[in-house]
Amino acid sequence: MARPDDPFESQDDVSDKSEDDELDEQDAVSLLTSDHAEVKQMFEEYRQLVQNDADDDRRGELAGRICSALTVHAEIEEDIFYPALRERLDDDLALDQAEVEHAIARDLIEQIVAMEPDDALFDARVLVLAEYVEHHVQEEESEIFPQAEKSGIDLDELGAALAERRHELRAELEAD
C-alpha cells in the first residue's frame, strides 16, 4: 500500500491499471517529459510552502521527495537514455552538457539531503535547484528530445527499459 507521502505511487486505484502501469507504457520521451512535469509540480508546491511560511516538516518532506525523484530521473537518463542516444547521434555536445548539469544538480541534492529544513540556506538551495532543473528541462525538451525522436531509435522499447529501471530504483529508495 502506498504511503500518503510516497511520490512514486498512485493514490487513485480506481481501475485495474495503476497510474504507474500506464506511465510504464509510454515511449521514452513521453516518460521523461512526465517525470519533468511531476518534478515541476513539486517545485511549485515547494515555492508555495515557502511563500506561506509552512512548517519545517512539510518543507523537508517535500524537499526529500523532490530530491528522490530527481535522483531516480537522472540515473535512468544517464544509465539508459543518454547512452542509447550516443549510439545514434553525431553530436554528443548536448548530451555532455546534460550530464554535467546532472552532476551539478546531484551536488546540490547532496547538500540539501545533508541539511535540516530549519538550516540557513535550506530553502535557498531547494529554490536554486528548482531554477537549475527548470533550465535543464527546457534544454532537454527543446534540443535532446527532438533529436531522439528523429534518431530512428525505438522509443517504445527505450521507454519500457526506462520504466523498468525507474521502478527498480524507486523500490530501492522505498526500502531504505
Residue ranges and their predicted role:
Residues M1-D176:
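Small-residue-biased structural context
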